[in-house]
């Protein structure tokens, strides 16, 4: 596989963490963010100062700002508020999930309704800037990954998020397929069929992929895919959180579910405990002052063993194996046909997950694929393919769910079956169900059920102007066209009159093209102001940290001369006054003045034996540097068998 140099970045937009990669000097490189990490928490916070925080900065303040700190947005994107999975999250998320006017999922951000793609766009902006800072020039094109089992609306909503972030999304690629590209990148020998088991923070996918290698030319063909877009590490966390809440209630008689701050602290500790239990057999969840009642403060200190955690989540792991069985059946394969098993997603680091997958396939999963980075690497490879930088690679992906229309009797008639290789196009002739019917409604559906009502409604449109005729006489040609992103385009044509209507199925993001363009223009126009605001806030935060540490040092200082104390307090007052304004330069000057004048405090510190003047200066320097759908009109179609020419 020959690799040159390209500028189409690959982004793994994850539920829990996101990652960005690019092709550089013939190799794929995962890029570190501004905090020095190769992955970025998919967390976005909106502060009282109107600052938007992304990643670790957002995560750090989540305990004190739970209602405006958003995580696991990927579980909500492209969904309806009434969806069962959404209603489950409504009851457990610290932030407020609301319904838009048309019934889509939106979020309450500081008492304003915001669409999930708009929030996800902030993560994509961070990934974009991470890449730009690394290569030193503007990035406008990207390949973004989605769970293989994402439906059409979820895919389109992801593209909307990319557009809002200022990115031209060249391709939406399935996460397991991307992982297969990463796995097959350097493999030189032979053809093989692999299983990609992808258990991430919020979603689960299984894909069966055949890699053909003929004279160095590699074809990655997805044979089948299946999954659950609402099953992942967040659900594992929830099981542990519920256990801890119940144990605490038994001990103290207090239900922490009524305390958002306590629940946010518990979520962080539960995630940490879960991760620790992948390498140790017991850990403590120790949260002092978790809550209080009339008798005083209450503390949580509960031991959790690996065995206990496994008993809590084992059912979830077994739940992932059902789609695996279905995917093998759809591919007409047996377990023995699988050559390699690739684990992707952070939750696959759990020993019990690895054991259950190993037991199922009868072989140990590969250990040479980084589960946190493989998807972004594969996305970068696909970006290279699109740019012409990666040679001798052909990717054949599939549509995860069947697509069709509602016909007579409320039945879904399938036009494109699940696991059909994309891009693809299929047409079928339908007719009217009543005499002199002048219009039909094309109701587009996605799913595997026979009853239309049991499937996902993607949208509908009308074809009118049909010439009067007996029922069954007009010929209406319905065409489904799926592009390489897995996004559906539908047309209906009256073959007698030539009248035609088309629709591109759009996401349930509640965002029109005009709204998306407006958000993008606002983002671009305010970019410089946003940077200045961010720098000002960082400087004010540094000043706050310095004021806090200086006051603490004054309290600890022994025999501090009154004259010196007065001098330091004057500088403190000047800095406090300065941070009430908007002059960043003045704040910086006042910071430096306070650092200089307070450096003498070390000489009077109670901890002088452990702290010298150099340490104080280093500390201060460090602080400076860390700156609803309409009712369906009956679409009464009667299928006419295709006439052969």
UniProtKB/Swiss-Prot annotation:
Up-regulation conditions: By stress conditions e.g. heat shock.
Keyword Chaperone listed: yes
Gene3D superfamilies to which the protein is assigned, alphabetical: 1.20.1270.10, 3.30.420.40, Actin, Chain A, domain 4, Substrate Binding Domain Of DNAk, Chain A, domain 1
SUPFAM superfamilies from the UniProt entry: Actin-like ATPase domain (SSF53067), Heat shock protein 70kD (HSP70), peptide-binding domain (SSF100920)
Positions of modified residues (Phosphothreonine): 203
GO molecular function: ATP binding; ATP-dependent protein folding chaperone; unfolded protein binding
Pfam family, one: HSP70
UniProt keyword list: ATP-binding, Chaperone, Nucleotide-binding, Phosphoprotein, Stress response
Free-text function comment from the UniProt entry: Acts as a chaperone.
Family in the record: Belongs to the heat shock protein 70 family.
Protein name listed in UniProt: Chaperone protein DnaK
